[in-house]
Amino acid sequence: MLVLRILSRVTRNAGIRSSLSAVTLPARNQTPVFSSRFHSLAHDFSHKLVPAQMSMMDSFALQRFNFSSSTSPESDEKKTHTEASKTSEEKPTAEANQPGLDSESKDSVTDSAKRKRKGAKGAASSSSESDSESDDDELSADDLVKLVAEKEELLSEKEEEIKQLKDKVLRTYAEMENVMDRTRRDAENTKKYAVQNFAKSLLDVADNLGRASSVVKESFSKLDTSEDSAGAAPLLKTLLEGVEMTEKQLAEVFKKFGMEKYDPINEPFDPNRHNAVFQVPDASKPEGTVAHVLKSGYTLYDRVIRPAEVGVTQGGENQEEKKESDA
């Protein structure tokens, strides 16, 4: 019974307070929008406050008369927090649903917020532009001149470096061409003169065949066939034919591989092609003429592999002309 009396008193006090607030609020000189808003807030607050007061009184009464409750103070605090959050969430909805606030006021609020955002963005962009302009203004004319001079100097250095590299490339290319030509020429010469040493070793064989052929011819010419009782003439003739055939075949092989024999009789002496072994006094020929050949010379293509061994005239027509000119 005591609990019911306390609860009835609390509800009566809350009703009186709400009626007083409703009576006193219109007396103030305010706009209808703000008065209605405040009235709704007060009404909501009174409705939220009454259950909270009742819950507090219930807990007080139960503690006064030693009654235990299943709810703890922590749960009461949680309830108060949740109720406060609900009231805070219901305030904007109540304000939006009030008849005093129309759509135009809402649009004005949103427009003002947008203008503030645009103003903030414009201020940020203007500040960045001013910073960039200040950075540009920091470079004076002298600094620009120095910067241009440095760039021109760097450009000239790069151009000189490019020029040197071009010259180096041209020199390298020319050297490479020379190396390629020299390599090609060496390869051709190696192939061309590969048989030089082998052919040079066969020159003595060719000389001996020539000497044998000349001796057999001389012996065969001196032989008297009428007094030849042993039959040596046919044998010498067969030997001569065999030697001559062998000599001819060897000469053909030499010619096939680029070797040629030359006999410089009655030619002017040439130290590149002739090797003077002795001198022959002969007034009928000009001085320095090849009068006698001991060994024939051989060439492999355009290269002399063995110069001819010759005898050169001495005291010929040139010496007589000198004597006449002196007289």
Swiss-Prot record:
The keyword Aminoacyl-tRNA synthetase does not apply. Residues 1-39 form a transit peptide. Keywords: ATP-binding, Chaperone, Copper, Metal-binding, Mitochondrion, Nucleotide-binding, Stress response, Transit peptide. Signal peptide: none annotated. It is found in: Mitochondrion matrix. InterPro entries: GrpE (IPR000740), GrpE_coiled_coil (IPR013805), GrpE_head (IPR009012). One of its GO terms (biological process) is response to heat. GO terms for molecular function: adenyl-nucleotide exchange factor activity; ATP binding; copper ion binding; protein homodimerization activity; protein-folding chaperone binding. The keyword Chaperone applies. Residues 75-93, 103-113 have a biased composition (Basic and acidic residues). Induction: Induced by heat treatment at 38 degrees Celsius in a HSFA1-dependent manner (at protein level). Pfam families: GrpE. Residues 130-140 have a biased composition (Acidic residues). Residues 68-140 are annotated as: Disordered. Essential component of the PAM complex, a complex required for the translocation of transit peptide-containing proteins from the inner membrane into the mitochondrial matrix in an ATP-dependent manner. Seems to control the nucleotide-dependent binding of mitochondrial HSP70 to substrate proteins. Binds ATP. Interacts with copper ions Cu(2+). Confers thermotolerance to long-term exposure at moderately high temperature (TMHT at 35 degrees Celsius). Probable component of the PAM complex, at least composed of SSC1 (mtHsp70), MGE1, TIM44, PAM16/TIM16, PAM17 and PAM18/TIM14. Interacts with SSQ1. Belongs to the GrpE family. This is GrpE protein homolog 2, mitochondrial. It comes from Arabidopsis thaliana (Mouse-ear cress). The lineage of its organism: Eukaryota, Viridiplantae, Streptophyta, Embryophyta, Tracheophyta. The gene is Mge2.
